[in-house]
UniProtKB/Swiss-Prot annotation:
Domain of life from the UniProt record: Bacteria
Its biological purpose: Methylates the class 1 translation termination release factors RF1/PrfA and RF2/PrfB on the glutamine residue of the universally conserved GGQ motif.
InterPro entries tied to this protein: DNA_methylase_N6_adenine_CS, HemK-like, Methyltranfer_dom, N5-glutamine_MTase, PrmC_N, RF_methyltr_PrmC, SAM-dependent_MTases_sf
Official protein name in the record: Release factor glutamine methyltransferase
Binding annotation for substrate: N205, P206, P207, Y208
Single Gene Ontology MF annotation: nucleic acid binding
């Protein structure tokens, strides 16, 4: 079987997944699987489409295709996912980084850069990423802020925490792979942190889905860890906990940025306001949905 013949076969098999994943790109995924097994570039696979696959390659492709046909996310099958400017390892112990979270990174960068150029930073910029998972948010911030802080003679201290030991280990691997200086710690939210430590900025993409949400039975989330998706109180328990506890770990005029569901913004703003946060605002994602809410502490 040639590259071209296998691609056509894989596209036919994967088309059955369209019902559960309407955004599935069967053409791209068939090429990705070929790239993974043959170790050849996309351009090479397309240019030499009549190349015949070996028996070993066909067996490996059959295994990968079977996993994808069952709905397993392509990121888990490949073991990696692009986020921001980074290539990150992923596993079944972590959420798969999504483009919507880059909105959180963008606005966190805006705040951090303003902080660096203001009188609020004295020698160090400290950032905490709660529920870090793959380390995506923390590492993206490190990639962008390291040159700026070095130029300004400021020490950059970024800490990512996660309750899952395997996620912490994976995040450390991603930091090493991308040659970025970020510390990672196993902790249930703030529990394992030094109570004396203070941060300029706290960011988080916490669990925010209600356990009865029908979307949990659709698409990639069927394979992702429920502990990283689902929260009590109809999805608000972890958000509420973070908003209530964050002031204990923030420097004066520090900020908290939280990602949440697109229909949760009003309730999240209310929780911020009831806890006496200032300048509470919600920011939209690339689809125009309210996705990130921030607040500043006095």
């Amino acid at each position: 079987m040639t590259y071209q013949e296998w691609r056509q076969f894989a596209e036919h098999v994967l088309m059955k997944n369209k019902e559960n994943d309407p955004f599935l790109d069967v053409k791209s995924e068939s090429v990705l699987l070929l790239q993974t097994v043959t170790k050849r570039s996309k351009a090479s696979i397309l240019a030499f489409s009549e190349t015949v696959l070996t028996e070993v390659e066909l067996q490996q492709l059959a295994q990968l295709l079977m996993r994808r046909a069952k709905g397993e996310p392509i990121a888990y099958i490949l073991g990696e996912k692009a986020f921001w400017s980074l290539s990150l390892k992923v596993s079944e112990h972590t959420l798969i980084p999504r483009p919507d979270t880059e909105v959180l990174v963008e606005h966190a960068l805006d705040f951090a850069k303003q902080r660096v150029t203001s009188a609020h930073v004295s020698g160090e910029l400290s950032i905490l990423d709660l529920g870090t998972g793959t380390g995506a948010i923390a590492l993206a911030l490190a990639a962008e802020l390291t040159p700026l802080t070095q130029k300004c003679g400021i020490n950059l201290n970024i800490l990512g925490v996660d309750r899952i030991a395997e996620a912490v280990a994976l995040a450390k691997d991603n930091a090493k792979q991308n040659e970025l200086k970020v510390n990672f710690l196993q902790s249930v939210w703030f529990d394992a942190l030094n109570p004396e430590i203070r941060f300029d900025l706290i960011v988080s993409n916490p669990p925010y889905i209600d356990k009865n949400d029908p979307h949990l039975t659709q698409g990639d989330v069927r394979f992702e860890p429920l502990s990283a998706l689902v929260a009590a109180e109809e999805g608000y328990a972890d958000i509420r906990h973070i908003i209530e506890q964050a002031p204990l770990f923030l420097k004066p005029q520090g900020a908290l940025l939280l990602e949440h569901g697109w229909q949760q913004a009003e309730k999240v703003r209310s929780i911020f306001q009831k806890n006496l946060w200032h300048n509470v605002a919600t920011l939209k994602d690339y689809s125009g949905n309210e996705r990130v809410t921030l607040g500043c502490w006095r």
